[in-house]
Every structure is written in structure tokens, then in C-alpha cells.
Amino acid sequence: MGSLKEIDTRIKSTKKMKQITKAMNMVSSSKLRRAESNAKQFRPYMEKMQDAITAVAGSDKNSRHPMLQQREVKKSAYLVITSDKGLAGAYNANVLKHLIKDIEEKHASKDDYSIVVLGQTGVDFLKNKGYDIHDSLIDVPDQPSFKEVQAIAKKAIGLYSEGEVDEVKIYFSHFVSVLENTPSTKTVLPLSPEDSSLGHGQMSSYEFEPDKEAILSVILPQYVESLIYGTILDAKASEHATRMTAMKNASDNASEIIDDLSIQYNRARQAAITQQITEIVGGSVALE
């Protein structure tokens, strides 16, 4: 058991830390609500895009657009979504662990894949592990706009369009609920047959000019960019939820430590008082 001064110092420092983690919990809670709202508001746009894809591509099974063509996978591109900041529990670790596991199982050479990273944490981790990073985007806002992440989405799509890779996959943490987030993988290129038939068919009676292939060349890249953006919004909600939970757990642990230290402090104080009384009584007896 430490001295009264040492225990008191630890109590004060732990209380300060609790104030910080509690404040961070409240901030993350606010950011989570906004992130959930952003993802919800983006869904109608995606549904309309899917309607357009269904109308144009769903009725034309002979489309030769590269984004709809399945080809032999010789090289893959992995878009990895992580956070720029820490204190987010296992949010980054789970996604990066999932990525590395797949790379080790599927690829014998670094020439077989390219990695594009969102978030400083992912950049630092992969560089320290010796992985080459083709491109990256850091300092991503907590509530990113489409324009702020469009450039990195275009680069990932460009790798596929230019024939440098044969598929593009996203590794991210999927937001299920405040208490549940799942490391997930999504293939965004090539688009599967299901992707061209997800709409509600509300545009099937339209005529398209100049022709469907020309329209597909415009809307398919926009659609894939939207898929990537929607996934980033999902991952951001997961990040805020994980950080909120981590800060709550840290605050709860700080409370337990403060309680334990308070008990130690009271015991030490009681022992000191008892010792003083004993010395006084002993001194009185000696004077008699």
C-alpha cells in the first residue's frame, strides 16, 4: 500500500482521465448520430442509381461494358478503410487482420495485389509490416462529403478500368448496431449480375439516347463511386460507435480504479490515525 500522498495523487490523475474519456464518449455519441443520419439519407440516392442500372443494364444481357464483365483474376486491388485517430478499440485491428489474412492466403507475391488505404492508422500499420501502398487518403473528415473521397474512389476504379487489376474489393468495418460491428469485405468491381438487377424497375419504360452502352459508360463509374462512398459512410458510423464504446469502457474502468484507490486511501488514513493514537497513548503511559 502506498503512502497517503501517492494514493491521493493517483486518485486525482485517474479522475482527470475519467473526465477526458467521458467527454470523448459524448463527442463520439454525437458523431455517431450524424454518421447514421448521413448513411440513411444517402440510401434513396443509391436506390435511384440502382433503378437506373436495372433499366439500362438489366434488360441488356449482352452488354460488353468492362465493369460488367467477369474476367480471370490475376491481380487484385484492395481498398482498406481505417481511421486517422486511435482510441477506437479493435476497430482498425479487426479490419487489418482480416486483410492480411486474405493476402497471405491468396497471394504468393506482392505483384499480385495493390493496396489503397483510407486513414493514417492503416497507412502506418501496413508500412510497418512491409506492405507496399499504391495510394492513400488521410485526414478524412468525421462526416465526409462525396467530393472529399471521390478522388480516392476514382483511383481505385482507375486501376480496374485501365486493366492494372481484375477486381476491386473493399475491407471495412460494417456498422450493425452501437454494440456490434463486423469486419467485412465487399467486391465493387466487376459488378455482379445481381448488381444490375437490384432496382425496382421504375425506369423500365424509358427510352435511352444515344444508346445504352453510352449511358452505361457514364453511370456505371458514378454508381461504383457511390458504392464506395456509401461503404465509407458505413465504416465511419462503425468507427464512431466503436470509439464511443471504448471510451465508455474506459470511463467505467476509471470509476472502478477510483473506488479501489479510495478504499486504499481510507485504510491508509485509518492506519495512520491509529498509529498516531497509539503513539500518544504510549507517550502518556511513559509520563505516568
From Swiss-Prot:
Query: Where is the protein found, in the record's own terms?
Result: Cell membrane
Q: Is-annotated flag, keyword Membrane?
A: yes
A GO biological process held by the record: proton motive force-driven plasma membrane ATP synthesis
Q: Keyword Cell membrane on this protein?
A: yes
**CDD domains documented for this protein:** F1-ATPase_gamma
Q: Which family is annotated?
A: Belongs to the ATPase gamma chain family.
Role noted for this protein:
Produces ATP from ADP in the presence of a proton gradient across the membrane. The gamma chain is believed to be important in regulating ATPase activity and the flow of protons through the CF(0) complex.
The entry's protein name is ATP synthase gamma chain
Species source reads Staphylococcus saprophyticus subsp. saprophyticus (strain ATCC 15305 / DSM 20229 / NCIMB 8711 / NCTC 7292 / S-41)
Write the lineage as a comma-separated list. Bacteria, Bacillati, Bacillota, Bacilli, Bacillales
